[in-house]
């Protein structure tokens, strides 16, 4: 780390022990000084949100393992919530759907490919994907053509959990900051924000404008 000051992201609501462990590790690796920044604030800074101003800003960071939801103002986090559902859970939801609805076993890589090719929060095209897997009943290889509607149905259990977390954050946001969000909306970050039409789904569900950073 070349004996320089380092800024490191930490999980929101990290314990003092966890924070000290991260600082000690960075110092042991050669950093001269370590500044810890909570993940939601780092995501908001990266998205260009005016978090230091006396207005409310909201960021939803959909990563691989967790979804971090935070409302910020005056440089601090006013409300935050961490959900243990995100990109990886979307893949697992596809696997579970294929097994239950199609009697087909697929692996993680196939599920991720389905998510990227035809995954969507709101079906909006006739795109299809020819999926290969193993038939649960016969044990033989099998091909099935999936539609965007199929993919959306597979993803909705996880998307609904994310929507629930966003609604809870909005319900716990102070009224004066809620008024700011009506105009500013919320910002989506992270790999999960790349899911087709997820911004439209969240906007329809919350009534807020949604921007993908």
Spell out what each predicted region is.
Residues 1:
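ABC ATPase A-loop
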Residues 4-7, 11-62, 70-186, 193-213:
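Nucleotide/phosphate-binding catalytic cleft detector across ATP-hydrolyzing
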Residues 65:
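Conserved Rossmann-like nucleotide-cofactor binding loop
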